[in-house]
Amino acid sequence: EFNRGFCALLCKKGFLVYSMEYRLVPDCKIFDQFRDVFSAMNFVKEHAVEDGGDLSHVYMVGDSGGACLITYTNAIQNNRKIAQAAGVRPSNLKVNALGLISGMFYTAKFDKIGMFLPKYLYGKNYKNTSFCKYVNPENPELIEALAPAWLVTSHDDYLRNYTIHFEKALERAMKEHELVDFPKNKKLTHAFSVFEPFLPESGAVIDMLVKYLRQF
């Protein structure tokens, strides 16, 4: 429920918004989260038109771990090998573009997150699985499978480097994307536009996000 304000502001921009719920680690693995997202996407496909939506213009927006999750689910949708490695059946709801806010894209770096998270996300023996190579979000197959993406971070976002590095991977692959990086401001912390959606800068984030998404 914490993102209700952010979702409401997107609604005011003319979007039909569904807020997806999914199970959380350590009660499940990331593959279970993929299944939850795809189940929600199937629900959207079945109900969006009767709810007043347009299935020819579908977008996914996520922050922090949610941004990571929709990055992977989008790639899984568009690459059968990744789907098979994950052991999931993707939704066939076409996603036109992504909005990635302060994404926690990297889960296995040699840092505070990567030191403990992988075994909970992927299982203790994940290095011996076919999904192992996709744990790195810069995997060329994964990058190539992504829809156009709008990314935002800020100087005071503790995961800023994740967005900066991931954007460079998109740039190297010549993938359609746009990056917004807010300057130093103690109010503009991790995923500020979701946690504090009524800040002026949060309004600017939503305006820029909407402008980008509507191109696709």
Language model feature labels by segment:
Residues 1-216:
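Alpha/beta-hydrolase superfamily serine-hydrolase fold, recognizing
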